[in-house]
Amino acid sequence: MAQLYSSVKPTPMLKDELDIVIPTIRNLDFLEMWRPFFEQYHLIIVQDGDPSKVINIPVGFDYELYNRNDINRILGPKASCISFKDSACRCFGYMVSKKKYIYTIDDDCFVAKDPTGKEINALEQHIKNLLSPSTPHFFNTLYDPYRDGADFVRGYPFSMREGAITAVSHGLWLNIPDYDAPTQLVKPLEKNSRYVDAVMTIPKGTLFPMCGMNLAFDRELIGPAMYFGLMGDGQPIGRYDDMWAGWCVKVICDHMGWGVKTGLPYIWHSKASNPFVNLKKEYNGIFWQEEAIPFFQSVTLPKECTSVQQCYLELAKLVREKLGKVDPYFITLATGMVTWIEAWEELNSAEGTEAEAPKGKN
């Protein structure tokens, strides 16, 4: 595992244009090992669970801390779209941010090391991924052609070499892999030690299981679609929040002509969650995903949808019409999707209400 404190302080990229969003139910001691990489950035911490519990944050970080009472105060009746007792609550941080970019990480994710033993600056790599183009329309067999030491291979169309705007950078994990509960149960001791030094664009028309524990995106571009759904307390499903967002985001990025990257950077995922608890959360989703994925694979958004908000509302309508037949939960989820967009517009319009930082600065 990585040492507790890195000795190297890098020059921060985009420090005034990026927020780090962290959902948590516990003290954030893990930030100490990220201090050299995160200290000069602004943090948005979304406290899940009991709002009366005091969350301790190491001294020296610039942050806002929101709990459920703050979410209810800021959103009023629209707070119903934000999940409770589930890490899906992190998307509230996306909504109240005023920055162009978001990086979100879980509180059990530590600094990883590459095969040479060098600590990985995950945030820096995500930023590089977002600032360079993607290649969603034609696959380059050398993966990222914009990376140092790589280029487009023979046969790659010259007309496509400018690439597409990158909307999402999806990072990976060493140590504990992001498995579903059935896989956890049959492979309880499995660890991921395989470091693949590659970044690739997920091709247009291909879905992927997005994981929210090491994820960056262009908030101004795709933020309104980064809704992590209704999960956790009072809902018949959990642990599908990030994947639901990923399916929606990928369909919209394909429609808008934007790219989604996956691969580097790696973080060290420190602990496995309980597979029996996970199975209870995932049980319905294991069956529902067999209906949901074909739905997203077949969705075609009308050309009249020219903004992310329009695309997302169209998706919400289709979710209600098509997936509502699978289970009434999807009708509730579609309502949440619409409420999310209404709340996003309310907080992010030119005349929108400012979400006051409830705990000030540290």
UniProtKB/Swiss-Prot annotation:
Its EC number is 5.4.99.30. The keyword Metal-binding does not apply. GO terms for molecular function: intramolecular transferase activity; UDP-arabinopyranose mutase activity. Keywords: Cell wall biogenesis/degradation, Cytoplasm, Glycoprotein, Golgi apparatus, Isomerase. Reversibly glycosylated in vitro by UDP-glucose, UDP-xylose and UDP-galactose, but not UDP-mannose. Glycans are attached at residue 154. The record marks 154, 161 as: Required for activity. It is found in: Cytoplasm, Cytosol; Golgi apparatus. Signal peptide: none annotated. Its cofactor is Mn(2+); Mg(2+). A motif (DXD motif) lies at residues 106-108. It catalyses: UDP-beta-L-arabinofuranose = UDP-beta-L-arabinopyranose. Specifically expressed in developing seeds. GO terms for biological process: cell wall organization; plant-type cell wall organization or biogenesis; UDP-L-arabinose metabolic process. InterPro entries: Nucleotide-diphossugar_trans, RGP, RGP_fam. GO terms for cellular component: cytosol; Golgi apparatus; membrane; plasmodesma. Pfam families: RGP. Belongs to the RGP family. The conserved DXD motif is involved in enzyme activity. Heterodimer with RGP1. UDP-L-arabinose mutase involved in the biosynthesis of cell wall non-cellulosic polysaccharides. Catalyzes the interconvertion of UDP-L-arabinopyranose (UDP-Arap) and UDP-L-arabinofuranose (UDP-Araf). Preferentially catalyzes the formation of UDP-Arap from UDP-Araf. At thermodynamic equilibrium in vitro the ratio of the pyranose form over the furanose form is 95:5. Is not active on other UDP-sugars (UDP-Gal, UDP-Xyl, UDP-Glc, GDP-Man and GDP-Fuc). Is probably active as heteromer in vivo. This is UDP-arabinopyranose mutase 3.
